[in-house]
Amino acid sequence: MGFAPLLVFSLFVFAGTTKGFICSFDSIYQLGDSFSDTGNLIRQPPDGPTFCSAHFPYGETFPGMPTGRCSDGRLIIDFIATALNLPLLNPYLQQNVSFRHGVNFAVGGATALDLSFLAARGVQVYDVHSPLSTQLKWFRTYLGSICSSPKECSNKLKNALFILGNIGNNDVNYAFPNRSIEEIRAYLPFITEAVANATREIIRLGGTRVIVPGMFPLGCLARNLYFFPDGDKDDLGCLSSLNDLSIYFNSLIQQALASLRIEFPQAVIIYADYYNAWGFLFRNGPALGFNSTTMLKCCCGIGGPYNYDPDRECASQGVPVCSNPTEYIQWDGTHFTQAAYRRVAEYIIPDIIKELKCSYSSIQHLTEGREALHINERE
């Protein structure tokens, strides 16, 4: 699978590498897909309210009702906001809410590539109208509402953190039908270019600190395991060929970010290693509190070895939900549980904080308070 071995993080070691620096973020701007969407998809006419994330049991763990998050509760972006002592981001399409501390532009089902690009190559995308280019348009519109000149905009964004993704897995999923792995692989450079161009635009508009997550292991998703029952499996039961796609895409993204760092030396551009973060989780799940018998099974779903049936999805009538989502990694076959997102956040946040040169004191609440992340539980 190519996952990194079990890693041990110590807050005491981490503190020593960052002492003397202060994190001064006053806002976060998130672009991406359903792994980051906090409520935009369900507010898009005409079909928004019909999407599953608008219905229970989505949101059952937090906040106790559906919010548009494709999970039982919080997402990685929520834990990042909490770690930086900022409020959870409101979705761009929600009315009468505050955007003082940032905006979430991510939309469930979004692609990195424009829909016209995909359509020209025979890739059909249904019910999705807000690819990455649309989210950038929203950001430009928002920016125009808070500043009127490049200098003023740069000043407004000087203490902002941008997170671009993860995004790109939908481009791959939509292209799967009737295409070989080799054909899908040929799409990845185009997806990489779209992400790189979006990063470039964010920096040109005034962003100076940008996180670009990589792709998670596609071969471990219950949905993909359902659709490729005869695929080659690794020792964890994940599809090796699909995970190889993720690895290849991540190598392309890292190369693109290296070039962007040369192009924009004034910016801090961080690669977030989602692949190994999720790999850590799948490989060490039982030690982290997850049930060893349900690692690849859905908490909310029905049927088959993975508790997943695309014709009877989570939130559909008669589809059950597990009573213990904290013991499951997978939520609905395509997305993950709050418990899983929390653990991935634990994995990536220390590296992000270190690269952003934040002080230990600025992340004390990672291990204190009611929303503690307990990074040191790996020890």
UniProtKB/Swiss-Prot annotation:
The keyword Signal applies. Pathway: Alkaloid biosynthesis; ajmaline biosynthesis. The keyword Magnesium does not apply. Residues 1-20 form the signal peptide. The strictosidine aglycone-producing AJM7-DeltaHYS yeast strain expressing pathway genes of the VOM module, RsGS, SBE (GsSBE, RsSBE1 or RsSBE2), RsPNAE, RsVS and RsVH, accumulates vomilenine. Additionnal expression of pathway genes of the AJM module, RsVR, RsDHVR, AAE (RsAAE1 or RsAAE2) and RsNNMT, leads to the production of ajmaline. Ajmaline is an anti-arrhythmic alkaloid commercially used as an efficient drug for the treatment of arrhythmic heart disorder. It is an enzyme of class 3 (hydrolase). Keywords: Alkaloid metabolism, Glycoprotein, Hydrolase, Signal. Expressed in roots and leaves at low levels. This is Acetylajmalan esterase 1. It comes from Rauvolfia serpentina (Serpentine wood).
